[in-house]
């Protein structure tokens, strides 16, 4: 692949998994993805019904019960890019995304940082895990208030969808968690970034409660990268 294409793909991946400026801040990654100035807006919370509150409680209990997770992912962006790979999660705070060839992308969250590694470009990008949308999934206590605001809850047949935004920076985008219902299982998440690019990350072959090597979540050094 050409270096120009690899750089383009790097920016797309950052936008997709990290949510670009969403939950990060305009000055952090906007230069990478060429974002324009983002106008502030007020977050509008959904008017909660009794059923909404019950479902949010169910989701919180479900997510908190997932201590480890392993599976695959299929990533589809509204700009036409499709990628796949493997995902590993160890709560709280640890994630790993391994992209399938020909991409050379690796992402690791070690509890503090979320690190993007492009081996072909020999480039590494660090952001604080708490500034990314995925930090919500791996925090020890799942809370649908405070830093995040629930803006929509929908229930298509057999599905539960919950959309959240950053409470203090809603203009930067949203993440929607999509679950199959009865039993409750996380199936995918959908990120809409500040440039209105929509990215869906579908989970496949998910296993939970399995033993994972702690080294999966160790940040690579020059010797082992």
What is the meaning of each model-derived region?
Residues 1-14:
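N-terminal secretory signal peptides that target proteins for export/translocation
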Residues 11-26:
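Sec-dependent N-terminal signal peptides
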Residues 23-37:
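C-terminal segment of classical bacterial N-terminal signal peptides
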Residues 42-63:
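Extreme N-terminal tail/first-helix region
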Residues 118-164:
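Surface-exposed, polar helix/loop patches in the mature regions of secreted/periplasmic/lumenal proteins
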């Amino acid at each position: 692949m050409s270096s120009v294409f690899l750089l383009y793909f790097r920016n797309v991946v950052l936008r997709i998994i990290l949510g670009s400026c969403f939950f990060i801040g305009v000055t952090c990654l906007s230069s990478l993805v060429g974002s324009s100035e983002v106008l502030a807006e007020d977050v509008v919370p959904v008017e909660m019904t009794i059923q909404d509150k019950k479902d949010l409680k169910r989701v919180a209990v479900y997510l908190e019960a997932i201590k480890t997770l392993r599976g695959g992912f299929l990533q589809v962006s509204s700009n036409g890019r499709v990628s796949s790979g493997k995902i590993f999660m160890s709560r709280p705070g640890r994630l790993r995304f391994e992209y399938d060839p020909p991409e050379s992308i690796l992402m690791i969250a070690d509890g503090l940082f979320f690190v993007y590694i492009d081996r072909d470009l020999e480039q590494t990008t660090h952001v604080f895990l708490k500034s990314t949308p995925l930090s919500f999934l791996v925090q020890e206590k799942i809370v649908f208030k405070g830093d995040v605001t629930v803006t929509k809850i929908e229930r298509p047949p057999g599905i539960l969808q919950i959309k959240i935004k950053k409470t203090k920076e809603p203009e930067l985008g949203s993440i929607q968690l999509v679950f199959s219902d009865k039993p409750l299982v996380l199936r995918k998440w959908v990120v809409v970034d500040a440039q209105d690019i929509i990215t869906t990350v579908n989970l496949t072959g998910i296993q939970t409660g399995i033993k994972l090597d702690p080294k999966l979540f160790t940040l690579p050094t020059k010797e082992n990268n």
